[in-house]
């Protein structure tokens, strides 16, 4: 597959953009080669600047539940643009989208919009600190909550420790109040509480999507709820990825556990830049101008983004549980086919499906936390990614990302991809 134009475009981009990309994973460093530069997309397919066509399982990293260039969402955006791009003033569209989300998520009594998931999680943590009057937070190895300084933390020694920055440019003092625990390990969380003089909140992806797809266990989620209740700490579900992806009511509906706050993004913007955080009324009342905790944004509640979000959520409501059942059946079909191919070619593989999300690891053992995810064969993943890209299948360019099914996909497309997986694994086996 020729990608001459993409190579030239990438080289040109590197002259004016650091690394040639505006988000590091897009540079293909983990898998090698040149990232395709995308010209256009429709439904389940991307088309690059060389005219190559790819079946897309990245879907802009999750927002596009209905696929690229969905007509209903596009129409809503076009109508909104006619009225103006941005006002910096309240609009009824903000209220409408807030009501749509609140109606579908138990426990979300009030919500505020931001322009990204990073802003949403950053603001939710600030609010939890303001509400509780405490400084420390607990997060988990392998859970990504955006690139705000306090959350760019890696593990020290032991099960749970005060965090160390995992990026240059983040002072130690910025992360000294961030404690790190092991995912799916309640004892490590208890140790964090013991180390702290006061935990404001526990934040996690209830279905982790940034160490590969690793769901929390039911026992773990219920245990966190109990611990937070006992300690007076705010439990925050980061549903930026799993919201309106894992199920009709997100991860909290799957587990039957209601957090005190939740953060959203991706799907609620229908492809436009949107984030949100919401929760109990007494917590949200601490936000300025009602309370003293400050949060703001020039483009927060942007009317074009709100229009896309309203159209997206209303389509989800129209599809209902049947929509999520169909998407999950496609994800299961894809992963079952993948497992059969891996067995045929004697390649170790672990797979996971939750709603319209799927993940796989080239790993001999099941994965339940970040440490286990790191045992995966990343060199094999890189070869597989390259082989699939050559066959016109666009996968996330890291072993530690999640794949997404969209509503424009069907069984015949999934079966086509399974055949390509078989070919790719056979090619890898030949060396």
Swiss-Prot record:
Record keywords: Cytoplasm, Isomerase, Porphyrin biosynthesis, Pyridoxal phosphate
UniProt keyword DNA repair present: no
Entries under CDD domains matching the protein: OAT_like
Cofactor(s) recorded in Swiss-Prot or TrEMBL: pyridoxal 5'-phosphate
Enzyme Commission number(s) from the entry: 5.4.3.8
InterPro entries for the chain: 4pyrrol_synth_GluAld_NH2Trfase, Aminotrans_3, Aminotrans_3_PPA_site, PyrdxlP-dep_Trfase, PyrdxlP-dep_Trfase_major, PyrdxlP-dep_Trfase_small
Pathway noted in the entry: Porphyrin-containing compound metabolism; protoporphyrin-IX biosynthesis; 5-aminolevulinate from L-glutamyl-tRNA(Glu): step 2/2
A GO CC annotation given for this chain: cytoplasm
GO BP term, pick one: protoporphyrinogen IX biosynthetic process
Localisation per UniProt entry: Cytoplasm
Hydrolase found in the keyword field: no
Example of a GO MF term: pyridoxal phosphate binding
Reaction(s) the record says it catalyses: (S)-4-amino-5-oxopentanoate = 5-aminolevulinate
Residues with PTM N6-(pyridoxal phosphate)lysine: 266
Matches recorded under NCBIfam families: hemL, PRK00062.1
Subunit: Homodimer.
Family: Belongs to the class-III pyridoxal-phosphate-dependent aminotransferase family. HemL subfamily.
Protein name, UniProt field: Glutamate-1-semialdehyde 2,1-aminomutase
UniProt organism field: Wolinella succinogenes (strain ATCC 29543 / DSM 1740 / CCUG 13145 / JCM 31913 / LMG 7466 / NCTC 11488 / FDC 602W) (Vibrio succinogenes)
Lineage: Bacteria, Pseudomonadati, Campylobacterota, Epsilonproteobacteria, Campylobacterales
Gene: hemL
